[in-house]
A protein has these predicted regions:
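Short, cysteine-centered beta-strand-loop-beta hairpins and adjacent loop/turn segments enriched
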Residues: 99-108
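A short, structured loop/turn motif at beta-sheet edges
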Residues: 82-90, 105-106, 118-124
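Short beta-strand edge/turn micro-motifs at domain boundaries
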Residues: 109-136
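Basic/polar N-terminal segments that are highly enriched at the extreme N-terminus
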Residues: 1-9, 136
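Short beta-strand segments enriched in hydrophobic/aromatic residues
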Residues: 34-35, 96-98, 131-134
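A solvent-exposed, acidic/Ser-Thr-rich amphipathic alpha-helical stretch
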Residues: 8-9, 27-88, 94-95, 109
Length: 136
């Protein structure tokens, strides 16, 4: 495997780890993967550029309903593309397909378009920016 292919595989794996941390509500894993000064545009931000981690931490800290069992969640990166801008900056773009159960217990799949920027800092890739859009 070439160095570029290895780096591409690593970034796709890190992106999957990031989505798994979000799905599991694992703040510690999320923090290991993202930069302190993460920026983003996402539907929850209502068109505003969010900077830092406090906005995201709010969602991780929300209590679950103990009366309801956790729903299974599977995230698939459909048609992922990795583009390197340098040895230390890369873009990962894909459609995320999130499979779960609705309130009636039926399987549902929800798509969203995501673009994520990663920067290698001190030899470690950190997630530094993302843009997530719901299909119109």
């Amino acid at each position: 495997m070439t160095a570029a292919a290895t780096a591409e595989a690593e970034l796709l794996d890190l992106s999957r780890q990031l989505l798994a941390a979000v799905a599991a509500g694992d703040w510690a894993a999320y923090r290991r993967l993202v930069a302190d000064d993460l920026t983003c545009f996402e539907p929850e931000a209502k068109g505003q550029l969010v900077e830092g981690l406090a906005f995201h931490e709010f969602y991780f800290r929300l209590p679950g309903d103990p009366a309801k069992p956790a729903r299974p969640v599977t995230n698939t990166l459909a048609s992922p593309v990795v583009k390197f801008f340098s040895d230390t900056v890369a873009l990962v773009a894909y459609v995320r397909l999130t499979q779960t159960l609705d309130d009636a217990g039926r399987p549902v799949t929800k798509p969203c378009e995501e673009t994520r920027l990663w920067q290698k800092v001190g030899g470690t890739w950190k997630h530094v920016h993302f843009h997530r859009s719901l299909p119109s």
